[in-house]
């Protein structure tokens, strides 16, 4: 069962001591995506990255706001 290896959102949050870790994860994911796009030379993928990046930033702000309320 694949789900056994996956952590719940709560478990992942409990491992993050600071929101900056979330930012690091977003940056890392973005860097990996850009690297894949550059290797594949897929022009369309670059266009698709922009809305994805916007969504990631929006989620990051929401997570930071939630963490601020918890403190």
Curated annotation (Swiss-Prot):
Protein's GO biological process: exocytosis
Keywords assigned: ANK repeat, Cleavage on pair of basic residues, Exocytosis, Membrane, Neurotoxin, Presynaptic neurotoxin, Repeat, Secreted, Target cell membrane, Target membrane, Toxin, Transmembrane
Main location group: secreted
A GO cellular component entry from the record: membrane
Similarity section: Belongs to the cationic peptide 01 (latrotoxin) family. 04 (delta-latroinsectotoxin) subfamily.
Domain remark from Swiss-Prot or TrEMBL: Two helices (H2 and H8) are predicted to insert into membranes and form pores by assembling into tetramers. The helices are contained within a helical bundle domain that undergoes significant conformational changes during pore formation to allow exposure of the transmembrane helices and transition of the toxin from a soluble monomer to a transmembrane tetramer.
Additional note from the record: Iso and Leu residues are assigned by comparison with orthologs.
Name this polypeptide is given: Delta-latroinsectotoxin-Lh1a
Record organism: Latrodectus hasselti
Source species taxonomy: Eukaryota, Metazoa, Ecdysozoa, Arthropoda, Chelicerata
């Amino acid at each position: 069962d694949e789900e056994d290896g996956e952590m719940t959102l709560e478990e992942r949050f409990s491992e993050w001591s600071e929101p900056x870790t979330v930012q690091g994860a977003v940056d890392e994911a973005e860097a990996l995506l850009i690297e894949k796009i550059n290797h594949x030379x897929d022009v369309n993928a670059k266009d698709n990255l922009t809305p994805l990046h916007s969504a990631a930033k929006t989620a990051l702000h929401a997570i930071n706001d939630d963490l601020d309320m918890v403190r």
